[in-house]
Amino acid sequence: MQKVVLATGNVGKVRELASLLSDFGLDIVAQTDLGVDSAEETGLTFIENAILKARHAAKVTALPAIADDSGLAVDVLGGAPGIYSARYSGEDATDQKNLQKLLETMKDVPDDQRQARFHCVLVYLRHAEDPTPLVCHGSWPGVITREPAGTGGFGYDPIFFVPSEGKTAAELTREEKSAISHRGQALKLLLDALRNG
């Protein structure tokens, strides 16, 4: 199996991606397990931040790297929290604090204006100086609820209602979520690109 460093310390992302990628002969190792510090996310887009993270991990470990940059974009908030999704409630942000801040921010937003999208950009670098990284983007439409529901997933999943499924992302099984989520879509594109050379 090819060892690949996953440029994240987010346990939820590691679990989700490692299980999906192991089927394709990739041995995913979290950068934290290799003593790699997080890259500074100075980009203004999901794509820029994913490339920064992958390049940093590949440079430090001399291994191929995969990085994920993802977040929630709420239409009525002009795309916020966007690239700041993980830090939306401030420097000491937690999933619960971020979720509560978003619900508070949107408390007066009518039900017909609560559309949002999860975005995920996955970047694969063959090596730190790779001039042609594979960049794959997935997006997942939904609606922000007024109260959390479900115990699965992580992040904003308990308040992200998926109309096609009739439940929140946190109420989906891992298999259901992987089949339709932003990360699942980006991963399918990445695996197709890896298969085709």
UniProtKB/Swiss-Prot annotation:
Keyword Coiled coil: no
The record's free-text note on cofactor binding: Binds 1 divalent metal cation per subunit. Maximum activity is obtained with Mg(2+). Activity with Mn(2+) or Ni(2+) makes up 60-75% of the maximum rate.
Reported cofactor(s): Mg(2+); Mn(2+); Ni(2+)
InterPro entries: dITP/XTP_pyrophosphatase (IPR020922), ITPase-like_fam (IPR029001), RdgB/HAM1 (IPR002637)
Catalytic machinery residues: D69 (proton acceptor)
Keyword set includes Metal-binding: yes
GO biological process, one term: nucleotide metabolic process
Keywords for this protein: Hydrolase, Magnesium, Manganese, Metal-binding, Nickel, Nucleotide metabolism, Nucleotide-binding
Residues the entry annotates as binding substrate: T8, G9, N10, V11, G12, K13, S70, F154, G155, Y156, D157, K177, H182, R183
Effect noted on mutating T8A: Greatly reduced ITP pyrophosphatase activity
Phenotype for D69A: Complete loss of enzymatic activity
Functional pH dependence: Optimum pH is 10-10.5. Optimum pH is 9.0. Reaction rates under neutral conditions are <40% of the maximum.
Top-level taxon in the UniProt lineage: Bacteria
Listed EC numbers: 3.6.1.66
One term under GO cellular component: cytoplasm
Phenotype when changing R183A: Greatly reduced ITP pyrophosphatase activity
Record GO terms (molecular function): dITP diphosphatase activity; ITP diphosphatase activity; magnesium ion binding; nucleoside triphosphate diphosphatase activity; nucleotide binding; protein homodimerization activity; ribonucleoside triphosphate phosphatase activity; XTP diphosphatase activity
One Pfam family recorded for the sequence: Ham1p_like
Subunit structure: Homodimer.
Family from the record: Belongs to the HAM1 NTPase family.
Protein name listed in UniProt: dITP/XTP pyrophosphatase
Primary gene name: rdgB
